[in-house]
């Protein structure tokens, strides 16, 4: 049975792919769950159009991620003042991904989502310089140094 996938299916393909599957798998699993449609000329044209729009969106997303990467690299490092720091250098609280995003925005960087920020550990709990990686796109990531300093 020849089908066009309308959803990503593990070990089979992604949206818009034309696949050949056994009749029972298509009739009893893929079609009832709306994961595929029967291949026809009209459906194939629609799938090709969806694939083209997805490819242009992927190119646009990659270009946008590269622009953000250049803006972040231009910053070099970001200072993050923390109000509550002990004399030993440990923080009473912790620095989260949201704090890093706010510091980047305050330093003149782009507005980012805190979910793309990957801290070395779950939270930063000490004063000093810490490398932070940001996953902007599945193929693009950038590293930024965050200087956590005690505010006096």
Swiss-Prot record:
GO terms for molecular function: rRNA binding; structural constituent of ribosome. Keywords: Ribonucleoprotein, Ribosomal protein, RNA-binding, rRNA-binding. The keyword rRNA-binding applies. Signal peptide: none annotated. The keyword RNA-binding applies. It holds the Pfam family Ribosomal_L9_C. Coiled coil: none annotated. GO terms for cellular component: ribonucleoprotein complex; ribosome. GO terms for biological process: translation. Belongs to the bacterial ribosomal protein bL9 family. HAMAP family: Ribosomal_bL9. Binds to the 23S rRNA. NCBIfam families: L9. This is Large ribosomal subunit protein bL9. It comes from Mycobacterium marinum (strain ATCC BAA-535 / M).
């Amino acid at each position: 049975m020849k089908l066009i996938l309308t959803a990503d299916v593990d070990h089979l393909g992604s949206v818009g792919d034309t696949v050949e599957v056994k009749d029972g798998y298509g009739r009893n699993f893929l079609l009832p769950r709306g994961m595929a449609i029967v291949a026809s000329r009209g459906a194939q044209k629609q799938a090709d159009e969806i694939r083209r729009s997805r490819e242009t969106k992927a190119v646009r997303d990659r270009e946008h991620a590269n622009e953000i990467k250049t803006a972040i690299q231009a910053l070099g490092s970001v200072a993050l003042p923390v109000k509550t720091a002990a004399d030993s250098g440990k923080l009473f609280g912790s620095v989260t991904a949201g704090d890093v995003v706010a510091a980047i925005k305050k330093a003149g960087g782009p507005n980012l989502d805190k979910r793309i920020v990957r801290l070395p550990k779950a939270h930063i709990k000490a004063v000093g310089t810490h490398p932070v990686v940001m996953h902007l796109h599945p193929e693009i990531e950038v590293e930024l140094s965050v200087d956590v300093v005690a505010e006096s």
